[in-house]
Amino acid sequence: DRDKDNFITDIPSYLLKIGIQINGTYKVHVDKRHNLWVLQGQNAFYFNFSHKTLKTFKIENFPEETPELSISDDGENLYLLWNSTLLKLENNAKKCKRVDNISLPSNSIIEKHIYTDYHGGIWLYSYTDEQIFYKKNIKSEWNQIKLHSKIETKSNAVRSILDDSNGHVWIGTDR
């Protein structure tokens, strides 16, 4: 709780205070604008901390349990990736749509994670190896990114991808 400079550990009670009632398993994501997204079952909740407003989205054909779900945002929209399905929640339109025109690379990424950068680029990576795929925008082709071969580490498995306001992309590996 930033207003009270307090660390909250009872998340369900806090969510209830802001109008989000959850039962069972849920996922939480804080977006690039520091707003809260909560996903549970076929519902997505968006809480804007600055305006103290809550939006609710219905995600049709979304499985109730998605333990392998990866979440990212581009500052406006939320992207949900699981198995070989990519969904985009359009915050301004208050709707969810399946991004069918994006075919995910079938190369040997076993466990896919997604990161969307500030410029609309989409990054896929795995915690288990150094494979990285990048798409400049939804309409462009996938490019496989190779990490510099002179990096001397025992493992280049990608742990995270972030970009900064200067346009630099930072790729975190095991070592």
Outline where the language-model segments fall:
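Carboxylate-rich, polar loop motifs that coordinate divalent cations or form catalytic acidic clusters
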Residues: 1-175
